[in-house]
Regions:
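Intrinsically disordered, low-complexity segments enriched in small residues
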Residues: 1-48, 52-304
Length: 304
């Protein structure tokens, strides 16, 4: 309805990939879009995100999922793409913060260590319970680090909508990944274009975008040079101190020589991370975690 507000039960969270979602022969096919009515604007918003959940949802037979209504207590939605059923159950005991919850749920739903790569989770955290800027975290299993990592749908406060519905997590499990699980019409055409793109990445990325070195953070100096950096909430397009947050700074933090990627077969490998970052404040002080990013949007929107 036109008068639906962000915290109305009728407000939906929609998560979808696309016609070639999850295809491993073309880079970027692991992305999903998340749509809802934003608590910040009371208007429709969308956010783009990587991670395993979108492709796994597609492989389980769903083009999209719509989360509507409100639960009385915290719940987990489980999409079983192995035995083909969906289950909703209460989850009072599990953690709320994603970096802890994701590990708990992966252990809960994976059959063994080798099955951890077949679990995709959407969750948020305690910040979403206490603000209108909560984000959604989408997990992916980093086989090289043997750890669960996360990408973010960070715009519009969508995580706050998620928690307002009393959803603690949405979990999707599949039996494994193959080359054409969503049965695209013309796989040969995708493969041909994928090979072309992969060749360009191999030959040009190190001298152009450097996605495999610094991810989307390479855009910082480009946007500053072209007067497009959102400085002081778009009052200006550049700033003399922009080099303090440009890609060279982030590269010094990012772990190098690891082919990062938030989806299988994506040759951009732009999911850069800071390993063993020690938290210095709050309830997790002293713990060492993996910090993903920052992406350009975070560095520019919150840094400039």
């Amino acid at each position: 309805r036109p008068d639906t507000r962000w915290d109305d039960p009728d407000n939906e969270i929609v998560i979808a990939s696309g016609p070639v979602g999850g295809i491993t022969q073309y880079s970027g096919a692991g992305k999903s879009l998340v749509v809802t009515i934003s608590p910040q604007t009371d208007s429709v918003m969308d956010s783009n995100v990587g991670g395993f959940f979108g492709p796994f949802l597609k492989f389980s037979g769903f083009d999209a999922i719509e989360l509507q209504g409100k639960a009385a207590n915290d719940v987990i939605v489980f999409i079983n793409g192995v035995d083909h059923y969906v289950e909703v159950f209460e989850a009072p005991a599990e953690a709320i913060d994603s970096h802890v919850l994701a590990e708990q749920l992966t252990e809960m739903f994976a059959n063994d260590e080798s099955d951890r790569k077949n679990i995709g989770i959407v969750s948020t955290g305690s910040a979403a319970d206490n603000s209108l800027i909560g984000m959604l975290n989408f997990t992916f299993y980093d086989g090289r680090r043997k750890k669960i990592r996360m990408k973010q749908a960070g715009r519009g406060g969508i995580g706050s909508v998620f928690r307002n519905k009393k959803i603690k997590a949405v979990v999707c499990k599949i039996p494994g990944v193959k080359g054409n699980l969503n049965n695209v019409v013309d796989l040969e055409a995708i493969q041909e274009r994928g090979r072309r793109f992969n060749r360009e990445m191999r030959e040009l990325d190190d001298s152009q975008c450097r996605m495999r070195q610094v991810g989307t953070a390479h855009l910082m100096e480009i946007m500053d040079d072209h007067d497009l950096l959102p400085t002081h909430n778009y009052k200006y397009g550049s700033h003399k101190d922009a080099p303090r947050i440009d890609s060279a700074v982030w590269k010094s933090f990012f772990t190098q020589n690891i082919p990062d990627g938030c989806w299988i077969g994506c040759n951009m490998a732009c999911a850069k991370a800071v390993d063993d970052y020690e938290i210095t404040t709050g309830p997790y002080a002293g713990q060492k975690v993996i910090v993903d990013g920052p992406e350009y949007e975070t560095a520019a929107g919150l840094g400039s």
